[in-house]
Amino acid sequence: MNNKFLSKIFIVSLLISSIISCKSNNKSETTSTKLVATEIKTLFDNQKEPKTSIEDSSLLTTPNETIAAYKDANYEPLWIKDEGLTNNGQTLINFIRNVRSYGLIPEAYNLQKITSQYNKLQLDSLWENERKNPKNWARIDILLTDAFLSITRNLDRGYIPLDSLSKDATYSAAKYKEALINTGKTDNLLQILESFEPKSKSYQDLKKLLPNFLSAADFSKKYTFIDYPITNKNKFVAQIIKRSKEENLLPNDVTNLDSIELSNLVKKIQEKKNLEIDGKYGRQLILALNNTDSEKFLKIVINMDRLRRNREEYPNRYLWVNLPSFYLQVFENGETKIESKVIIGKPNTRTPLITSKINQITTYPTWTIPTSIISKEILPNIKKNNNYLNRKGYSIFDASGQKVNPDSVNWSSYEKGIPFKVVQPGGDANSLGIMKFNFPNKYSVYLHDTNQRSLFNNSFRSLSHGCVRVQNWDSLYQYIILSDKRANDDDIASNGVLVDSVKTWLNAKKRRTVSIVNELPIYIRYYTAASKNGKIEFYEDVYGEDNKIRNLIMKSINPIATLN
């Protein structure tokens, strides 16, 4: 053999030896699954009853489910093999790092602790003793299991415990446990996690737009959230002081403000936020202060959470009212057929969430005033002015339907209600306008025109007693009739004749009712963030529902068990 050939053999042998050595060293530098399993069991066994924690002050959100999972697995690690993290383990860490793109909050899954622990276990780490310690591998395995169980539950049902919002809701961890078992059968962890997400267009559209929002967002600075509506002035003052310090509008030693100082501070904030400078605090000021990227992201989280809990499938044709947007839309086969501004209930006379079907249209309707309005508005006004009913054009009727003379009633004898119906006759001055859309519901709510059409020019349109006023009522009734399949008549032309009839009734100011055969499904819902025209639209939390969910989410993501 020549020297060149021998040299080649030597080099190949050296490479083989090096590879074998590296593999051997790699195993020795990590640890074996048997040792990790022993440490997992020890970590749990060493805890006092009830076993809701493990060592080193790490935090768990699903302690009971996590412990049960390891008992079922005989304490074998679920994310680690002899050579280190499994592919699924690495995928899960990456998922948690990017969990915002799924509308989830990183802090809910021990991201900081997992990252710190993971860095100690890297082969290029300076923490050689830490890397060789099986207890550290046990810790990260437990943290990953806890995170997985939390993520699957949150992707499936949201952050909020169902029984906190719904009395008849039930919760079962069985499917999350089954998903955990399935991670040992496939390397496609992402598919397992995404299988828990809603498939609805509303959810998926919002999710698709999240990366663009996140790429432009700045989460580097945390700002104090200002509660609204203001229910406690002292709390509000404390919050606005703290918030102002964060923007260097107040010295750090300020702890309280008198009324003049508060007004001057508000003026500073109004100037900075390009608001009208009047020194008065209210809705616009607080909206501007809470308009941070962190709060916008949390609003997205809240609404994706709603979509996870409210998994609805919609028909090909339906009417949609999103209350915070102050808009109505009619969708047909994914296309928007009608869009209209709406006026919704005031915060103290809210429009309820409703699922129903529009089954009647009435021209020049009368208005039978709800008992709640009679108690709160009508009766007090009658007591102040005997001529109130006549001035408003209201009539009253007894239980038998007989008209009653208001002057014959001793109004002072009634405190909370009256044994009469109060009815406003149809006409241009009627509060319902000249068109009403009926749909069965227990709240006596309907869509209608209005005699105060100028209010549609307002940007904030939470102004009604609870019903939904529709600006484009004329387009809506024509769409409903033209798309209706009349009984025993397949000729669409006959629907056109009916539209003409309705126009005739309107011109003649006649009260008529049209029954709809092909009833139009209607959904009245509440979403403060939604996709529209390829971007995320944010809407004001008109009824304070976001605040309720925000508080529940913050409470639910605070871990309930400590690794101590």
Regions found by a protein language model. Give the residues of each.
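Phosphate-/polyanion-interacting regions in eukaryotic proteins
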Residues: W137-A138, R157, S164-S166, N182-K185, ...
